[in-house]
Amino acid sequence: MKASRFFIGTLKEAPADAEIVSHKLMVRAGMIRRVAGGIYNYLPVGLRSIRKVEAIVREEMNRAGGIELLMPAVQPAELWQESGRWEKYGPELLRFKDRRQSDFVIGPTHEEVVTDIARNQIKSYRQLPVNFYQIQTKFRDEIRPRFGVMRGREFIMKDAYSFDKDMDGLRESYRKMYDAYVRIFTRLGLDFRAVAADNGSIGGSGSHEFHVIAETGEDAIAYCPTSDFAANVEAAEALPLYAERAAPTEEMKKTPTPGKAKCEAVAELLNIPLERTIKSIILATENEGAEPTIWLLMLRGDHDLNEIKASKLPGLAEFRMATEAEIIETFGTPPGYLGPIGTKKPIKVVADRTVANMSDFVVGSNEVDYHTTGVNWGRDLPEPVVADIRNVKKGDPSPDGKGVLDICRGIEVGHVFQLGTKYSEAMGATCLDETGKPRPMEMGCYGIGVTRILGAAIEQNFDDKGIIWPESIAPFEVVLCPMGYDRSEAVRAEADKLYAALVEAGIDVILDDRGERPGVMFADWELIGVPHRLVIGDRGLKEGKLEYQGRRDAEATLLPVEDAAQTVIGKVRAALAR
């Protein structure tokens, strides 16, 4: 590629709305341009990196037995109504009517469409297993698109869907996809972790997320540095922090706590550790034809409620936060002084595992400016329903028993699910088993955010000059920077010779023949992040030398002219082989 025949849209300044490094650099490097909120043009530099991500994904999906197809972005509402997600998905699902007033959606995922394919095309277990995949544009109407491609509304995604005759087959398909994802993200040159996760709106049972580790990541990941354990904080099991409950040493006492509505303030006033206070979270669930049920969830004062865990408890699937009016009616006091003792109406109490093993703890007295100290289970309160309802924290014991947890931030770039028969049962996707009886097919789904990978890679690989691409997804592998290409015949001849040698070797090279000043050339290519740079100048040629610098190198080195091409070819191939 010659730069004079390519489009290079670099900018000196980032747009004012760009908040994170990847968004700023993708705009400045001429990779993307905003069309509307969360919707971008992918300019030639950006598209080259996208195509390289897609190529690696395609190779590994094919290697794992995936079969590529292409499904429509526009999907009829009938399919979503069959699965039940038409009502459940929420405002992120972009819905519209055609001229015949028929309802359609722009697909955020394709479970319904692929299940429709399977039920019409797969009739016997002998046709299984099968794994269909596509690389397709998706749309989710995010309420607040931000961070460039990291949380856009329109994005490119690889989504795959496996169909098996039984759970053993599904587990094998899942394992193959998990292994394929490890290979994909390794080849992409990313520092990543596979973590146990919640299935969210997709549904199903087993699930893992693949996260690129970055300080700007939206997700918190709990991991054990001394073992292989890793899980999204939403899914990580929180073990009780006390092995057993200590015997009471205090009498229950109503204690003045004027103006102290928060656990931290109560602990400071009473001169006790925050860990001895109890945080009361009040939820409500609807009952058809009757008053809502009020729930009190008890957490240690320094812990936070995990709403996903809470929603999985019997009776809490559709919970909401109780209103202030409901709280006052039930407890006789506004939020801030609530507790399980002396409520005006019956409530259901759930204690976190750690709270269930506490003694001599402090709860609200259900009276403004008062808390009750020295509270104990059995003596002062009936034994509670006990459940894991909190987020893990740094320093908690690892669920695998092999150390303590640490917390880092991650950017989700891939997700694999064992769906089971959630969609096949709802949509009648059955096949005949060995006995000739119809049974719903076991499904898995497996997604990779192709465009999000670019942003995630940049969040891990940048400096004050610009992007530092992993070799495998750089828009170009090598840039040739001739000094005075339009003025010096010797420089032009050597640059053209090097260019031809690199092209013949299959190297993705760009020759900057624009005639720009050295400072402009270097700034552009450092911003774009090309991994290898060769500078050709009259002075160096007279000495038989060319200047080489890797994008991660602090200093340039001199190479003999006759060795330069093979040296750079070797560096590129070695980097790609890692």
UniProtKB/Swiss-Prot annotation:
Any transmembrane segments, and where? Answer: none
Per the UniProt record, one Pfam family is: tRNA-synt_2b
InterPro entries listed in its UniProt record: aa-tRNA-synt_IIb, aa-tRNA-synth_II, aa-tRNA-synth_II/BPL/LPL, Anticodon-bd, Anticodon-bd_dom_sf, Pro-tRNA-ligase_IIa, Pro-tRNA-synth_IIa_bac-type, Pro-tRNA-Synthase_IIa_type1
Protein's cellular compartments: Cytoplasm
Q: Name one GO biological process term.
A: prolyl-tRNA aminoacylation
User: What keywords are assigned to this protein?
Assistant: Aminoacyl-tRNA synthetase, ATP-binding, Cytoplasm, Ligase, Nucleotide-binding, Protein biosynthesis
Known EC number: 6.1.1.15
Looking at the UniProt record for this protein, which Gene Ontology cellular component terms does it annotate, in alphabetical order?
cytosol
Q: Which reaction does it catalyse?
A: tRNA(Pro) + L-proline + ATP = L-prolyl-tRNA(Pro) + AMP + diphosphate
Oligomer and partners: Homodimer.
Family in the record: Belongs to the class-II aminoacyl-tRNA synthetase family. ProS type 1 subfamily.
What note about domains is in the entry?
Consists of three domains: the N-terminal catalytic domain, the editing domain and the C-terminal anticodon-binding domain.
UniProt xrefs under PANTHER family = MITOCHONDRIAL RIBOSOME PROTEIN L39/PROLYL-TRNA LIGASE FAMILY MEMBER, PROLINE--TRNA LIGASE
The protein's name is Proline--tRNA ligase
> What organism does the record attribute this protein to?
Paraburkholderia phytofirmans (strain DSM 17436 / LMG 22146 / PsJN) (Burkholderia phytofirmans)
Q: What is the lineage of its organism?
A: Bacteria, Pseudomonadati, Pseudomonadota, Betaproteobacteria, Burkholderiales
Q: Which gene encodes it?
A: proS
